[in-house]
Amino acid sequence: MGLLKRAARAWKLAGQADSPPAQPARKEPTLTRTFKMARQTRLNNSWTGRSNAGDADHVIYKDHETLRQRAREQSINSGYAKRFYRLLRQNVIGPHGITMRSKALKADGYADDDMRRVIEQEFKKWSKRGNCDVTGRYSFVTFMWLWIDTLARDGEVMVRILRNWPNRWGFALQIIESDLLDTTLNTWLSNGNRVRMGVEIDEWEKPIAYWLKRSHPGDNFERPAEQEYQRIPADELRLTFDPWRPHQSRGFTWTHAGANDLHHVEEYAGAELIAAEQGAKLTGFYEQDAEWVDPPGDEDSDDADQGVIIEEIEAGSARLLPYGVTFKPYDNKHPSTNFAPFTKAAVRRIAGAFGPSYNRLAHDLEGVSFSSLRSGEIDERDFYKCIQQFAISELLEWVGEVWMECSMLKGVLKIPPRAWDRLTPIEWLPRGWDWVDPKKDSDAAKTGIETLTDSVSDIMRRKGRDPDDVYNQISEDIRRFKRLGIPNPYGKALQANGVTHVEPDEEDDDEPNATGTD
């Protein structure tokens, strides 16, 4: 038995040695959110409800029409929204528009001034009212005003180019509201492309064509019984919107982040205005004592006791009230003392959402120092410069290229095919701004030129001027001053830079130097 017990014990130990050690029971880790932004508590349930994991088109699709219609309503009835669109018109496009400048070159690489002059003059003619737009209502400047207004308000705008248009250049533009691009049109096509909210795209999400309704959905004068679409190729029509996310097919209003605050501010201000108006009109109330006055409507009472007191008020007069009637002044607290600071804080939020500074959006320069005004002005100008470059890349470069092609085909521009690349380059010059502090900014520009960290041409471009135009104008001024015997104001500047002579025109060859100095 002792032998058997020892054998059993040895067998048991051998089995334990071969088997793996027992693993402890798995314990699931406790997960905690590291980012406060991702935590879900009772205090941010509303935020969680607004979150959405859909793609860009899915998110835009649900609210697209509501966003557009509410933005249009505010553009009509809200002074702050109207101010925002006016600021874009003034600062992005400007009073004279974004100017086209030809950069044609001769075969030797120097500027072809004659060709540049011809191209720019023809474009100016085309830009006049009645030439550039299919309706004949707009000049190119007013067309761009409408374009930037529509882009910011609706979030998207379409421009169609019409080749072989019956004008001198065979070219015109048509601006189209995005209502005609059917948001509900989403399907796959037999050619393998798909339509997302009216935009036909290929497998790489490149726009191929746009499916437009033949009439505006809000046109109450002419609405066909059955809606039909027209397919416009993408090389004829450009849909412009400010991209928010990748894979996005449509845009939405630029005012979306501040529109809700703007709505409440307008409602609050309107209510305060009405309350203040009523308080100014209503000075007080008459109270009747039942012991002295008969009940209104009593047949035995006099006409004067019917509860109606006829008032005729004039300066320096007083009235004796009937017995039992006392006057109780109405103490109106509107507008409240919190009206101004609350409105100011709310408009600051709106300005932060829209883009321009609060001082510009609200027309409020109260308490603004010169240094803070200068800092804010520079930052705000960068905001407009970004939109200027967006307009150039999205629309103007495309318009310039097609206009050049159509003008050459119509024979307006005599450009041989072999010189196309040399004669057709153009540059778009957006509006600039004057210096906020002329003396300091002028000294800084001078220092930049002297230290070779800046150029005269770049300084001129920042002010919205073409350097070639400025140089030619200065040269012409000098010749004109000399011809008319007027002292030359450029003399000191030219002498300081070592310039003592400017080549005169042919008719001035026998006259002394044109700098106005001896």
UniProtKB/Swiss-Prot annotation:
Family, per entry: Belongs to the siphoviridae portal protein family.
Purpose of the protein: Forms the portal vertex of the capsid. This portal plays critical roles in head assembly, genome packaging, neck/tail attachment, and genome ejection. The portal protein multimerizes as a single ring-shaped homododecamer arranged around a central channel. Binds to the terminase subunits to form the packaging machine.
Species of origin: Halomonas phage phiHAP-1 (isolate -/Gulf of Mexico/-/2001) (Bacteriophage phiHAP-1)
Superkingdom classification of source: Viruses
Entry keywords, A to Z: Capsid protein, DNA-binding, Viral capsid assembly, Viral contractile tail ejection system, Viral genome ejection through host cell envelope, Viral genome packaging, Viral penetration into host cytoplasm, Viral release from host cell, Virion, Virus entry into host cell
Keyword DNA-binding: yes
Main localisation: virion
GO molecular function, a single term: DNA binding
Gene Ontology CC entries for this record: viral capsid
Stored InterPro entries: Phage_lambda_portal
Name assigned to this protein: Probable portal protein
GO biological process: symbiont genome ejection through host cell envelope, contractile tail mechanism; virion assembly
Compartments in which it is found: Virion
